[in-house]
Amino acid sequence: MKLVRDFNDYQILDMDKGMKVEAWHNVILKRPDPQIIWPSLNPYNAKVDAIYNRSNKGGGAWDIKNAKIPATWQVTYHDLTFNLKLMGFKHTGLFPEQAYNWNMLRMKIKAANREVKVLNLFAYTGAASVAALSAGASVVHVDSSRGMID
């Protein structure tokens, strides 16, 4: 996986035995990540705004710790602005590990020196579509996830 070091509105604050603490602009979230199997070297003990708790019946729910957490908020990456919210499946609607791919997509579109048309199938939350549009491409965004297209 390629990393980007300039996603100023996103930061991993801690990782500990299946849990990850992240800062999304000014919102601090703690949520499960099954790939984190190691103990924290520097535990994050400050307050978090919300914690996602898995249910043993499947799925889970957000436990809001800060009553002032906004229902939606924005983060920026370069000149892109994304609207986030707490989603039912432990995420926020944005996947920061994809930022490298957004960079590559934008670079390829800008370097094409021709009209570029992008068909983004299974586009889900749309960050790649936004990145392609920002680079000048014509984009068709297709997804069947009701929460993403409403």
Task: Locate predicted features.
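Non-catalytic substrate-recognition/targeting regions of SAM-dependent transferases
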Residues: 8-22, 29-96, 103
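Short, contiguous clusters of charged residues that form electrostatic/catalytic patches at enzyme active sites
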Residues: 96-103, 107, 150
